[in-house]
Amino acid sequence: MEETMTELGFQLYSARNFLPFSNIFKKLAAAGYKQVEGYGAMYASLDEAGLKALREELDANGLSMPTGHFGLDLLEGDPEKALNIAKVLGVKAIYCPYLMPDQRPADAAGWFAFGKRLQEVGKPFVDAGLTFGWHNHDFEFKTLADGSTPQEQILAGGPDLKWEADIAWIVRGDADPFSWIESYGKRITAVHVKD
């Protein structure tokens, strides 16, 4: 039997210009949200007390944070810190969300190697019982010289990586989201949708 995604949440990065988070959390709770997705800039620099205060604020508003975006620098450079952030905030799925333009490979082999690197980066998180994957933007769907796409190569290079599919970015990349979901649906563990 196939699983169906039925739990909806709010991606807090979308509200980053409307701080403080305490007000955002209250508004989301009043709107009926139960889950939010965090992002690196909101928690990567917090100390233990700051993380606990953030968790208390979420709890006070009836919100959980089952997923979070964590930058590649933190994931590679300080996986213990990333694990602690996830533990304190209750994050069950970590998604690496972006690769700066100057760091992006130029060919299929480079993207395959990046997928392999991501899978290795994710090992401590998977070993800790968390889901680990990649969150796409549009650049992963631009055709490479060999006819493949970066997204195909990332998933091939990291065969155990999960995928947080951002549907609007797939469309912005001139790709068909239905085709991608059909081909890789079993690896999709979360989805971003926008209007």
Positions of the model-derived regions?
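Acidic/histidine-rich catalytic cores of soluble enzymes
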Residues: 35-36, 123-195
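Charged helix-capping and loop-helix junction motifs
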Residues: 23, 49-54, 79-82, 108-119, ...
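Short, charged N-terminal helix-start/capping segments
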Residues: 1-3, 94-104, 162-171
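N-terminal pre-domain/capping segments
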Residues: 1-93, 162
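Active-site beta-loop-alpha junctions enriched in small/polar residues
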Residues: 11-15, 39-43, 70-73, 99-101, ...
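Active-site groove signature of glycoside hydrolases
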Residues: 91-108, 128-140
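Alpha-helical structural signal in soluble globular domains
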Residues: 27-31, 53, 57-61, 85-89, ...
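Surface-exposed, active-site-proximal loop segments in enzymatic domains
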Residues: 74-85, 98-112
